[in-house]
Amino acid sequence: MIHSRALRVVGSYGAILLAGVIACAATRVGQSGAARLQIVRADTAALRKKLDSIADAHHGIVGYSVIDLETGARINRRGDETFSTASLIKVAILVTVYDLVAKGQLSLDDPLTVLKIDQVPGSGVAQFLHNGTVLTVHDAAWLMSTISDNTATNLLLDRIIIRRVWAKMDSLGLPHTRVHSKSFLRNSSVAMDSSVKYGFGVTTPNEMAHLFELMALGKAVNPAADSAMLDILEHNTTDFMLQRYLEGARAAHKDGETNAVRTECTLWYLRNRVVACVLTKENTDQRWVLDNEAQLTLANMGLAIVNAFGGVPPAPPSS
């Protein structure tokens, strides 16, 4: 996946940036524990009307799925229609990695060696590391999920095998959520016809939203693993789509971008926990600029969803 936020460095700066990205986990202080705010019963009919209005104005196809985890309320548009994921499918890879760890078939400390032959373009820093650099499974999972590192993603797929991602998604009742190949390596596809149609991966708004719902409920792998994965996704660096107008909102999220595709799925920790997945395809505006139409569409939908649930809650008082 190539996009405007791709972190590009050369020489020794790659290793420096890599260390900084991984180290941020040790220094970031998340929002926590203050007294729980009263939940909001959103007017979902009004929210649906607002989201449909935004989607209707978009020059492309928009699907969405929104779930209020506190009340169980759900709304969707084209919820069961398949869309290209771009890098959003990396969430399914992350879940499979942690599932294999939980089963004792993989360790987060297992080494992964970066070889020149493994390095692919697009997002990330691992493509710039020197031949023979050793990461751990945890390092690669972190890089894949926070800066959408394509080389780190491929190292993980080599270790876990693509079909295991399919099997894990099937076990969760997500039969249309599929990764097809390694990133930027179409010839590694295990489903070439689907690769040609959808690219790197495919899902539906309802299925990807349900995957985030399962993580929020501790049912994707187990409560400890799901909590760890959501913590990683809270460190995602993308802030120009669903999160654009929501400064201060706590969110675990992942996005994807190709020329004609913009996607993002998020778990917001508002007064309610709210999952939202917005997928777009066949976008007329294919510019790689901040104000790309699809990115603005997602930004406006994100604002509408959060406002329907009472807006961004106040930050907890500092201790």
Locations of the language-model features?
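Active-site SXXK
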Residues: G72, S84-L112, A276
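Mid-domain, small-residue-enriched loop/turn segments at the edges of structured enzyme/sensor domains
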Residues: I61, T133-T136, A141, N154-F212
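A short, well-structured edge-of-sheet supersecondary motif
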Residues: A46-G79, V278
